[in-house]
């Protein structure tokens, strides 16, 4: 089924960023984090509570909705790992 709607406040980019701790551990992850939160906000604005407001839109499907919500949790970890790898690689030159 469709994941729980985060609410009009919950979809806000600033709330999303705070929840994910954007840039708190690694400032380099801030840009990726901000972009994700903005995309997530647009997704929810377009698709509404159960995908009904985005009639006929292919992005408004439950699989993607769950992926969007799950992505937030894994995003920071992945970004931090990527940044660490880039820093390590850059230091080798």
Curated annotation (Swiss-Prot):
<keyword id="KW-0964">Secreted</keyword>
<protein>
    <recommendedName>
        <fullName>Parbolysin P5</fullName>
    </recommendedName>
</protein>
<feature type="disulfide bond">
    <location>
        <begin position="16"/>
        <end position="37"/>
    </location>
</feature>
<feature type="disulfide bond">
    <location>
        <begin position="22"/>
        <end position="33"/>
    </location>
</feature>
<keyword id="KW-1015">Disulfide bond</keyword>
<comment type="function">
    <text>Cytolysin that shows hemolytic activity (on bovine erythrocytes, HC(50)=5.75 mg/ml). This hemolytic activity is completely inhibited by small unilamelar vesicles composed of PC/PG, PC/PI and PC/PS in 1:1 molar ratios (with at least 100 mg/ml concentration).</text>
</comment>
<dbReference type="GO" id="GO:0090729">
    <property type="term" value="F:toxin activity"/>
</dbReference>
<keyword id="KW-0204">Cytolysis</keyword>
<comment type="similarity">
    <text>Belongs to the worm cytolysin family.</text>
</comment>
<feature type="disulfide bond">
    <location>
        <begin position="47"/>
        <end position="60"/>
    </location>
</feature>
<keyword id="KW-0800">Toxin</keyword>
<keyword id="KW-0354">Hemolysis</keyword>
<dbReference type="GO" id="GO:0005576">
    <property type="term" value="C:extracellular region"/>
</dbReference>
<dbReference type="GO" id="GO:0031640">
    <property type="term" value="P:killing of cells of another organism"/>
</dbReference>
């Amino acid at each position: 089924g469709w994941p729980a709607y985060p609410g009009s406040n919950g979809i806000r980019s600033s709330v999303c960023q705070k929840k994910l701790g954007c840039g708190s551990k690694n400032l380099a992850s801030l840009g990726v984090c901000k972009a994700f939160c903005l995309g997530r906000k647009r997704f929810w604005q377009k698709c509404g509570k159960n995908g009904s407001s985005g009639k006929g839109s292919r992005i408004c499907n439950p699989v993607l909705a769950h992926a969007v919500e799950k992505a937030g949790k894994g995003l920071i970890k992945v970004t931090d790992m990527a940044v660490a790898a880039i820093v390590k690689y850059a230091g080798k030159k």
